[in-house]
Regions:
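C-terminal functional extensions of proteins
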Residues: 1-63, 68-137
Length: 137
């Protein structure tokens, strides 16, 4: 099994992971010690997952963290503030964190992710507003 196969077999046609798969947007899913039998694409080993996250954020131009405190803080800690593009230009890496808990977004900023833009709101509302703004709903 795989996430793309699951999406196809169960006729999934919406959601964040669906959107990433459909539009070929790379993502990293890491499990926790409590996970029981993660999906094939989920890194069960925390060190391997962190390495995959680090590799992906180094290639990113925009990172959006949604409602997972430990993953958000870890991602913020490993996200560079800029990226050198193949043509030599330097551009910023935009880091956004959305969580309903003010503690989470403050912790991200307290840990040194100074270039992060944080929003304290319900992730479902955030996604709805973004989708509406993009004319998707």
């Amino acid at each position: 099994g795989s996430i793309p196969k699951f999406i196809e077999e169960y006729h999934i046609d919406n959601g964040i992971i669906y959107g990433c798969v459909k539009n070929h947007v790379p993502f990293v899913l890491t499990g926790s010690i409590r996970d029981d039998g993660p999906l094939p694409e989920v890194y069960a080993n925390a060190y391997e997952g962190a390495s995959a996250m680090r590799e992906l954020v180094r290639k990113s131009t925009t990172v959006i963290c949604l409602a997972t405190m430990l993953h958000t803080i870890a991602t913020g800690n490993m996200t560079p503030s800029f990226r050198v593009m193949p043509d030599g230009t330097i551009r910023p890496v935009y880091l956004y964190a959305v969580d309903a808990a003010e503690f989470v977004v403050n912790k991200l900023l307290d840990r040194g992710s100074l270039s992060a833009t944080t929003m304290v709101t319900n992730v479902q509302d955030f996604i709805g507003k973004v989708a509406g703004g993009l004319g998707l709903i």
